[in-house]
């Protein structure tokens, strides 16, 4: 059994716990969040406005969260270096705080006795891995990043298209559901003025490093891809719109066939494929990183095409976090 601790019990941390509990090879032994007491952790885990109630039994015992009889120690420590990871025999820490996402800060978990760290955010300094794209390049690094939910949606599709037809250049737009950092009403947001506007009543243009990050996990696309985001008032599920200038001429049917083939092969759990007339809520709880929407894409000419792919930016991403944990273990 691989012993796992979760640092940061927000949207991703809680879903990662739900998923990890279903994996036979993993044992979650601890959760740390300085802002959440043990009884509140139980409540937040049990009830979820987006993904519904947890189906099993959730209680507490002293400082432990007890899920279906399985005890998980809960800590409220601000500095990861002070956590008892060594004493608990923690193999891998999943850091979903969004705070400790660089090598120097994530190192604190190793100093506390953990063997490895998986960061659930893009990182400037830690190597980034996207399951289905470059996880085979993993070479024993102790601190790794699972990149972002949008990179996990975009990279597999970009890889399939690039492998088959070549990408000369591409622009991505993600139409992205709201996240915890946005505001319920207009409020201060000094780094991103637009991001401080009411989330539920606006379409908000935003920056994203997701497209450029594809160049880190697929070096052959370095400098060929960039993108931006629109934050829209939906609670979960987002969609990538990728406009591509192809190196080789292709019909849209050939592109569809290439993605469909990949979705039935070794990328089966990562890439989904649909020709149905779907909308965003149809993908709530979908475990794929990306679902290619064959009937939404369009083609202008043999080398100029727009493809569309959906993703549950919470649940699908959390599934890949746990996949990466199993892989680095």
UniProtKB/Swiss-Prot annotation:
UniProt pathway annotation: Carbohydrate degradation; glycolysis; pyruvate from D-glyceraldehyde 3-phosphate: step 1/5
Taxonomy, superkingdom: Eukaryota
Binding sites annotated in the UniProt record for NAD(+): 11-12, 33, 78, 313
Annotated keywords: Cytoplasm, Glycolysis, NAD, Oxidoreductase
Family from the record: Belongs to the glyceraldehyde-3-phosphate dehydrogenase family.
Binding site for D-glyceraldehyde 3-phosphate: 148-150, 179, 208-209, 231
One cellular-component annotation, GO: external encapsulating structure
EC number: 1.2.1.12
One record GO biological process: glycolytic process
Protein name: Glyceraldehyde-3-phosphate dehydrogenase 1
Site label Activates thiol group during catalysis, positions: 176
Catalyzed reaction equations: D-glyceraldehyde 3-phosphate + phosphate + NAD(+) = (2R)-3-phospho-glyceroyl phosphate + NADH + H(+)
Entry's Gene Ontology molecular function annotations: glyceraldehyde-3-phosphate dehydrogenase (NAD+) (phosphorylating) activity; NAD binding; NADP binding
Compartments (UniProt record): Cytoplasm
Gene3D superfamilies per the UniProt record, alphabetical: Dihydrodipicolinate Reductase, domain 2, NAD(P)-binding Rossmann-like Domain
Active site, UniProt feature: 149 (nucleophile)
Assembly description: Homotetramer.
Signal peptide: none
């Amino acid at each position: 059994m691989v012993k796992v601790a979760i640092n940061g019990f927000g949207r991703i941390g809680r879903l990662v716990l739900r998923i990890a509990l279903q994996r036979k090879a993993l044992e979650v032994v601890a959760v740390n969040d300085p802002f959440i007491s043990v009884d509140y952790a139980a409540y937040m885990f049990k009830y979820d406005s987006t993904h519904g109630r947890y189906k099993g039994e959730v209680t507490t015992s002293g400082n432990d969260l007890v899920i279906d009889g399985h005890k998980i120690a809960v800590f409220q420590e601000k500095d990861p270096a002070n956590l008892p990871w060594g004493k608990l025999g923690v193999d891998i820490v999943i850091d979903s705080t969004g705070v400790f996402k660089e090598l120097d800060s994530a190192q604190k978990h190793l100093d506390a006795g953990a063997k490895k760290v998986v960061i659930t955010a893009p990182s400037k300094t830690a190597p980034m891995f996207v399951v289905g794209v470059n996880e085979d390049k993993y070479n024993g690094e102790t601190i790794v990043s699972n990149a972002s939910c949008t990179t996990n949606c975009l990279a597999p599709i970009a890889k399939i298209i690039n492998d088959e037809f070549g990408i000369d250049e591409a622009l991505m737009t993600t139409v992205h559901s709201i996240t915890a950092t946005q505001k319920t009403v207009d409020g201060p947001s000094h780094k991103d003025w637009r991001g401080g506007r009411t989330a539920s009543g606006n379409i908000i243009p935003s920056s994203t490093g997701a497209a450029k990050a594809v160049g880190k996990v697929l070096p052959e696309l370095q400098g060929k891809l960039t993108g931006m985001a629109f934050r829209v008032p939906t609670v979960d599920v987002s969609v990538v719109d990728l406009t591509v200038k192809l190196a080789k001429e292709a019909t849209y049917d050939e592109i569809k066939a290439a993605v469909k083939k990949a979705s039935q092969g070794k990328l089966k759990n990562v890439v989904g494929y649909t020709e149905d007339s779907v909308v965003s809520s149809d993908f709530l709880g979908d475990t794929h990183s990306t679902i290619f929407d064959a009937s939404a894409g369009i083609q202008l000419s043999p080398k100029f095409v727009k493809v569309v792919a959906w993703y549950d930016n919470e649940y699908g991403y959390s599934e890949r976090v746990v996949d990466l944990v199993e892989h680095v273990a």
